[in-house]
Amino acid sequence: MVKQIESKSAFQEALNSAGEKLVVVDFSATWCGPCKMIKPFFHSLSEKYSNVVFLEVDVDDCQDVAAECEVKCMPTFQFFKKGQKVDEFSGANKEKLEATIKGLI
């Protein structure tokens, strides 16, 4: 399951409550074509990797979160462990997304 983040406090709470689990954050926008293309794959990964926390942040709805995380383009995927960012990449690259998850869990 992918959790939609609607505020900066909800983002912090999601990172904190994840504990030791890997957190994968998809920063996207409704008007972004590549974001729409990879979204179903991102959701399928959330079912495949049930021990990983998947979050979605709409950069237009949560500009403060996007700014704090220094998101420059969409989609951007950021990976967190224990509240700290451990990896990041931009672009709708399905293979890289799954490989990064596998490498971090």
Swiss-Prot record:
Maturation and modification: In the fully reduced protein, both Cys-69 and Cys-73 are nitrosylated in response to nitric oxide (NO). When two disulfide bonds are present in the protein, only Cys-73 is nitrosylated. Cys-73 can serve as donor for nitrosylation of target proteins.
Keywords recorded for this protein, A-Z: Acetylation, Activator, Cytoplasm, Disulfide bond, Electron transport, Nucleus, Redox-active center, S-nitrosylation, Secreted, Transcription, Transcription regulation, Transport
Catalytic residue list: C32, C35
Site label Deprotonates C-terminal active site Cys, positions: D26
Localization of this protein: Nucleus; Cytoplasm; Secreted
PROSITE patterns associated with the record: THIOREDOXIN_1, THIOREDOXIN_2
Pfam families: Thioredoxin (PF00085)
Annotated GO MF terms: protein-disulfide reductase activity
Subunit structure of this chain's protein: Homodimer; disulfide-linked. Interacts with TXNIP through the redox-active site. Interacts with MAP3K5 and CASP3. Interacts with APEX1; the interaction stimulates the FOS/JUN AP-1 DNA-binding activity in a redox-dependent manner.
Full protein name: Thioredoxin
Taxon lineage: Eukaryota, Metazoa, Chordata, Craniata, Vertebrata
Gene: TXN
